[in-house]
């Protein structure tokens, strides 16, 4: 994962075991450093993590973390509701599901199965330049809009 993609507060998953944090552990980013020569033996970007379940703090290379896929279940757990579902009816048509958060009535997420990604809409206008596939991507957009970007996994 690239350090440029991350911000403090993002949720990520560890993909390589170390002696403190196990593979698959969900963590919150609490610090970012472009390089750390002492601990990692090179010019590798380093991220400081706080484990969600045990509240351990650990720094590790960005190579050892990945984004957590944004799923419909995670949206539902965080107060988003299925607003509308559309099935593909013709060759030119696409399937999609629209989700909104009642507390934030001006935003919605549309899931496109063909892309396996979401797009964010503000007042019915698409505002996400790239498909949203990971929790941290949604967190960045919500934060930029001044909305609550805290997400439970």
Please describe what each predicted stretch is:
Residues 11, 19-36:
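Short beta-strand-centered aromatic/proline hotspots
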Residues 12, 27-29, 47-49, 65, ...:
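Hydrophobic beta-strand residues in large extracellular and virion-surface proteins
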Residues 36-54:
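SH3/SH3-like beta-barrel fold
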Residues 53-84, 129-148, 153:
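Intrinsically disordered, low-complexity, charged/polar segments
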Residues 82-113:
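Amphipathic, interaction-prone secondary-structure segments
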Residues 105-133:
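Intrinsically disordered, low-complexity regulatory segments enriched in Ser/Thr/Pro
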């Amino acid at each position: 994962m690239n350090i440029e993609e991350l911000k403090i507060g993002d949720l990520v998953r560890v993909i390589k075991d170390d002696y403190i944090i196990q593979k698959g552990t969900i963590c919150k980013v609490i610090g970012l450093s472009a390089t750390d020569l002492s601990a990692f033996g090179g010019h590798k970007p380093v991220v400081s993590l706080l484990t969600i379940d045990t509240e351990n703090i650990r720094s590790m290379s960005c190579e050892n973390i990945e984004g957590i896929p944004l799923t419909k279940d995670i949206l539902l757990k965080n107060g988003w509701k299925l607003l509308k579902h559309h099935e593909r009816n013709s060759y030119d048509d696409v399937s999609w599901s629209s989700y909104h958060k009642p507390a934030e009535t001006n935003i919605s997420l549309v899931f496109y199965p063909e892309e396996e990604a979401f797009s964010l809409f503000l007042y019915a206008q698409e505002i996400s330049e790239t498909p949203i596939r990971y929790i941290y991507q949604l967190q960045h957009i919500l934060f930029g809009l001044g909305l609550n970007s805290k997400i439970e996994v």
